[in-house]
Amino acid sequence: METEQDEMGQEEMSPEMALDKDPFQLTVEDVYDISHVVGQDLLKINREARGVSSLVSDLQFKIVRVLEMLEALVNQSSLSAEELKMERDNLKAEVDRLLRDGPQMGVGPDKMVIDLTDPNRPRFTLQELRDVLQERNKLKVQLLVAQDELQCYKSGIIPSPDDQIVTLENESIITSSPRSNASKEKSTVKSLFSFKQGKNT
């Protein structure tokens, strides 16, 4: 049993296994194993075929060059992978440090933490929201005043400008339509609008 396990372990560790690996998972040792396998095959060819030794030696130089290039590529990729791992570790350490120091530096009882990935996060300052609400309230008041004014015109409490005839004689105003005392009293809204109309004319 032990001999079977040893044979299986040797098969798993045999240099030819490097040829079956994914190219992106090759290590420098795998390149050396491939070099060993190719070298053994070249020796067999050289022994069996006596007339092709010059062809085998030319082929051997080309194979050595390809293996050197492969070794350089594997070295570079393993170095790049190591650099990436080191960079990842450095970034993790930096994030951990910021998380430890963050609550002490930036957050206080009068500060708010905003999650930038939250789609429902606030997008305006509190003062901007207050300004918008005040402007909305002013516009509502103006709308209500205009609606009251319109209602007064419709009900006849305030006569339309067509009912009034104004003549200027010695700076006196004469009107032709009779009005009651209640209709003579102008509201501040009416005086405001008449003041504005007087400016426009």
Curated annotation (Swiss-Prot):
InterPro entries: DZIP_RILPL, RH1, RH2, RILP_dimer. GO terms for cellular component: centrosome; ciliary basal body; cilium; cytosol; membrane. It is found in: Cytoplasm, Cytosol; Cytoplasm, Cytoskeleton, Microtubule organizing center, Centrosome; Cell projection, Cilium. One of its GO terms (biological process) is protein transport from ciliary membrane to plasma membrane. SUPFAM superfamilies: RILP dimerisation region (SSF161256). Residues 14-108 form the RH1 domain. GO terms for molecular function: dynein light intermediate chain binding; protein dimerization activity; small GTPase binding. Keywords: Cell projection, Cilium, Coiled coil, Cytoplasm, Cytoskeleton, Protein transport, Transport. The keyword 4Fe-4S does not apply. Residues 67-155 form a coiled coil. Residues 175-201 are annotated as: Disordered. Residues 121-197 form the RH2 domain. Belongs to the RILPL family. Involved in cell shape and neuronal morphogenesis, positively regulating the establishment and maintenance of dendritic spines. Plays a role in cellular protein transport. This is RILP-like protein 2. It comes from Xenopus laevis (African clawed frog). The gene is rilpl2.
